[in-house]
Amino acid sequence: MSKSSKAYRAAAVKVDRTNLYTPLQAAKLAKETSSTRQDATVEVAIRLGVDSRKADQMVRGTVNLPHGTGKTARVAVFAVGEKADVAVAAGADVVGSDDLIEKIQGGWLEFDAAVATPDQMAKVGRIARVLGPRGLMPNPKTGTVTPDVAKAVADIKGGKINFRVDKQANLHFVIGKASFDEKRLAENYGAALEEVLRLKPSSSKGRYLKKVTVSTTMGPGIPVDPSITRNFTEE
């Protein structure tokens, strides 16, 4: 048995699978069950009661986490002229147009998010098949197709996350690092969950939040009580 398997098993026995934890309890337990030596990412997985094959039940959104993600995102911006200068001043990691598109077509993908001014989208469409499957395609719905590139870059650098329901009706998003204290993790969880709840499709019937788990990278899933939709930092 590998050391990582042993560490996972040791962590997993600390989680009572029959219990539904509060967000604060889950955050604390996630820190305790992190089975890597590195500062693990803390993630949330939610099973929604929607039919994601239907356009009117697509759940997709963004939220600015109050305490950030613990990682400074690398941002690429598609812009020219004054907007390109503004993007550079705002802290974008790479800015360009045709040159940036050619670089990406050549296999370069060393960025975590992409922003584009509206006039660049016809060009960016040429690499949609590269960016789309990786969740990197700029989109007006997530605020990443905008003339206000400074705000878009600042939001992403400040801890803005995107989420989108997949074909199996699951959502996945990051709420921080294992080095965060549990209150900060719980507050980030609360901010994200409130946005997920706000986006509930009117056509969705039955229970909306079917299952919620919190975990660290390589750590066991910790079941969270899906009925807790406020007072996230209470035990």
From Swiss-Prot:
GO terms for molecular function: rRNA binding; structural constituent of ribosome; tRNA binding. It holds the Pfam family Ribosomal_L1. One of its GO terms (biological process) is regulation of translation. InterPro entries: Ribosom_uL1_bac-type, Ribosomal_uL1, Ribosomal_uL1-like, Ribosomal_uL1/biogenesis, Ribosomal_uL1_3-a/b-sand, Ribosomal_uL1_CS. Keywords: Repressor, Ribonucleoprotein, Ribosomal protein, RNA-binding, rRNA-binding, Translation regulation, tRNA-binding. GO terms for cellular component: large ribosomal subunit. Gene3D superfamilies: 3.30.190.20, 3.40.50.790. Binds directly to 23S rRNA. The L1 stalk is quite mobile in the ribosome, and is involved in E site tRNA release. Part of the 50S ribosomal subunit. NCBIfam families: rplA_bact. Belongs to the universal ribosomal protein uL1 family. This is Large ribosomal subunit protein uL1. It comes from Mycobacterium leprae (strain TN).
